[in-house]
């Protein structure tokens, strides 16, 4: 008999199992016919997994070798095309375009960093997600395209060198959910979820739980589905000629212009905001745009390029589902449960926490300025633009175009905009989310809203709004700006709104 010593003993899961006195790990007789791991020599093996024969170890690949996760068609002067599965050697790693050489053709050029993964790592595996938080794992697995049993393995947020398994499941009370399992490490380099069975590598673990649930909530069906990433913007293309853009479909029109889906240079799908002539100074816009392009975060719409001659064009990443206020009214938006709605709010708070950290101000935070991707990821748009608008109907603050119902009292009365006035607006945005896009202060005109706010009035709790969420709204609507919470606080509360009292991980099977 023998054992494999683990640095993570879990004695309470080992009833009715003989264990080693030193390490408390299961001891299995050589002639055991149970489904426990089989010891051969010094190895513990899974009877449900077919192991590869004993082969000499492969020569380790060099650290600068990558494998293409997707094919790439060159579209710029100096970039390098390649096919999915092709190996490349990285020559220079800087920014979002890396200089590389194809081992297939020998050609050199620049490649998009997000189309490749390190060859000598887990990164090329479709089920492995390197830098993914527990919350984002849930968002990915619950996104359209994934089903019961979809799964991924991610790096542990708290323990370097450890991993977690996240699996999509169905709960009778909660509906579609994601369950998480800690993957524990053995001293000999192996892994286990349940101490009943260990694996020499993560590939073996995945293969086993694909064949049988063996104590998990369900069998693993297929890796979490993700879309081919959008290539990074070519860094030298900032002020671009108007003729490089082809406007294809008008997505909407607002008070200051139109938004179009279009293509840049015939190959890159983008959103183009065309501003009405005279709505802002081109020089002031360019100065602000140069600041805006430095604000890069996964929860902010990426600003790609500008056309600075009037009519001004703002070229950004394209978001398939358009504005949040419109999406919430669609059949897909109406079906969203309160958990998903609050997750959207948490994503917006995360983006605003970054803006807060950068000492920036949005000035026009509302659901119309939040965009939604096809995987229901929310991103903040139009940050900073409001201060440049030169339309009298807007700058007068009482004018017809000014968003009174979203604006903090000190900004309405004195023109004082701070990150705390953005917090007030976020509280209003929360009402839009839980009412699926209803206009705030229903039945009130703008002058009535101003008069009522001066008397201390606050919007009543919307139908189907949890009491705890309404409490959060009321914190955002404190009269004194300094009494309102930070966006970092709002993000933390919304992130854990339904999970604060639940265990983050499933017990060992």
Curated annotation (Swiss-Prot):
This is Proto-oncogene tyrosine-protein kinase LCK. It is found in: Cell membrane; Cytoplasm, Cytosol. It catalyses: L-tyrosyl-[protein] + ATP = O-phospho-L-tyrosyl-[protein] + ADP + H(+). GO terms for cellular component: cell-cell junction; cytoplasm; cytosol; endocytic vesicle; glutamatergic synapse; immunological synapse; membrane raft; pericentriolar material. Its main location: membrane. The gene is Lck. Autophosphorylated on Tyr-394, increasing enzymatic activity, this site is dephosphorylated by PTN22. Phosphorylated on Tyr-505 by CSK, decreasing activity. Dephosphorylated by PTPRC/CD45. Dephosphorylation at Tyr-394 by PTPN2 negatively regulates T-cells differentiation. Dephosphorylation at Tyr-394 by DUSP22 negatively regulates T-cell receptor signaling. Residues 61-121 form the SH3 domain. InterPro entries: Kinase-like_dom_sf, Lck_SH2, Lck_SH3, Non-receptor_tyrosine_kinases, Prot_kinase_dom, Protein_kinase_ATP_BS, Ser-Thr/Tyr_kinase_cat_dom, SH2.
């Amino acid at each position: 008999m023998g054992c494999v010593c683990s640095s993570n003993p879990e004695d309470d899961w080992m009833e009715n199992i003989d264990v080693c006195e030193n390490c408390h790990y299961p001891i299995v007789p050589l002639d055991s016919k149970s489904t426990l791991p089989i010891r051969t020599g010094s190895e513990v093996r899974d009877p449900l997994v077919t192991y590869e024969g004993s082969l000499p170890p492969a020569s380790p690949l060099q650290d600068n070798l990558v494998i293409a996760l997707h094919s790439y068609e060159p579209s710029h002067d100096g970039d390098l095309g390649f096919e999915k599965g092709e190996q490349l050697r990285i020559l220079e790693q800087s920014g979002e375009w890396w200089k590389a050489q194809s081992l297939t053709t020998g050609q050199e050029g620049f490649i998009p960093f997000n189309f490749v993964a390190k060859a000598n790592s887990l990164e090329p595996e479709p089920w492995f997600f390197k830098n993914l938080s527990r919350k984002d794992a849930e968002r990915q697995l619950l996104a359209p395209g994934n089903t019961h049993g979809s799964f991924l393995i991610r790096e542990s947020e708290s323990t370097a060198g450890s991993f977690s398994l996240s699996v999509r499941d169905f709960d009778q009370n909660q509906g579609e959910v994601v369950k998480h399992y800690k993957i524990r490490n053995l001293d000999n380099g192996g892994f286990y979820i349940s101490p009943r069975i260990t694996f020499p590598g993560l590939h073996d673990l995945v293969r086993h739980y694909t064949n049988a649930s063996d104590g998990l909530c369900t069998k693993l069906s297929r890796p979490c589905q993700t879309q081919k990433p959008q290539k990074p913007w070519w860094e030298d293309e900032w002020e671009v000629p108007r003729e490089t853009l082809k406007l294809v479909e008008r997505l909407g029109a607002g008070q200051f212009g139109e938004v179009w889906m279009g293509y840049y240079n015939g190959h890159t799908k983008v959103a183009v905001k065309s501003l009405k002539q005279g709505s802002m100074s081109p020089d002031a816009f360019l100065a602000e745009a140069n600041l805006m392009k430095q604000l890069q975060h996964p929860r902010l719409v990426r600003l790609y390029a500008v056309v600075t001659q009037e009519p001004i064009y703002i070229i950004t990443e394209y978001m398939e589902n358009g504005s949040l206020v419109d999406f919430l009214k669609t059949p897909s938006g109406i079906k969203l449960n309160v958990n998903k709605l609050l997750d959207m709010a948490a994503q917006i708070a995360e983006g605003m926490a970054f803006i807060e950290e950068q000492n920036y101000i949005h000035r026009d935070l509302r659901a119309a300025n939040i965009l939604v991707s096809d995987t229901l990821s929310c991103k903040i748009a139009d940050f900073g633009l409001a201060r440049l608008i030169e339309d009298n109907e807007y700058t007068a603050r009482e004018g017809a175009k000014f968003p009174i119902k979203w604006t903090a009292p000190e900004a309405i009365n004195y023109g004082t905009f701070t990150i705390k006035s953005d917090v007030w607006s976020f509280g209003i945005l929360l009402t839009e989310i839980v009412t699926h896009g209803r206009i705030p202060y229903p039945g009130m005109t703008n002058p009535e809203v101003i008069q009522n706010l001066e008397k201390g009035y606050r919007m009543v709790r919307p139908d189907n709004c949890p009491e705890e969420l309404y409490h959060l709204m009321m914190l955002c609507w404190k009269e004194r700006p300094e009494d309102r919470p930070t966006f970092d606080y709002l993000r933390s509360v919304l992130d854990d709104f339904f999970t604060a009292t639940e265990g983050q991980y499933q017990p060992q099977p």
